Amino acid sequence: VHYEIGLGDSGLTYEVGDSISIFPTNKKLLVNSIISRLGVEKDTVPAGFEDTIEILLTEKYEILTPSKRLIEYVADKSGDKVLKKLVDSEDKKAIEDYKWGMDVLDFMNINPNLKIDVSVFLGLCQSLQHRAYSISSSMNKHDKEVHLTVSSVRWKNDDRNYNGVCSTFLADDVESGGELKVF
């Protein structure tokens, strides 16, 4: 999909071959599913935080790609012998193969009875990072715009649909004329 991002009076400049970084937000469905799985309300403010769990999971934390800390925690606490053996082996490729296509919710659900405190959970997650995309335009022709060509990442695994964080943020969540956080 072709996107045109207006630079307005930002003063941002670019050259051929540069990239632009976009700060996405997480999908509402996944955010709500994790909040439900944690057993708290959307407006819960976890101990040690100023924002609600909904804001934290939407804007601040990576909930698509499970962190090493989360995987180790689940392996230790879930009672899943296969995952525990895999993590104990420290075989990075085998762990990558195991977690391929899985998100944070999938790991939380390895043992549906596993309770995770909200503050502990957030400590196991990584910060939501910007995503960089190659610019497909030239300032010589478009001095107030950045053009991007982005393919939306989507897949289905078992009964769930999965979405890339930023590619589908651009495709589904940013309205024409809407604002983005970029650098």
Map each language-model feature to its residues.
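FNR-like FAD-binding dehydrogenase module
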Residues: 1-183
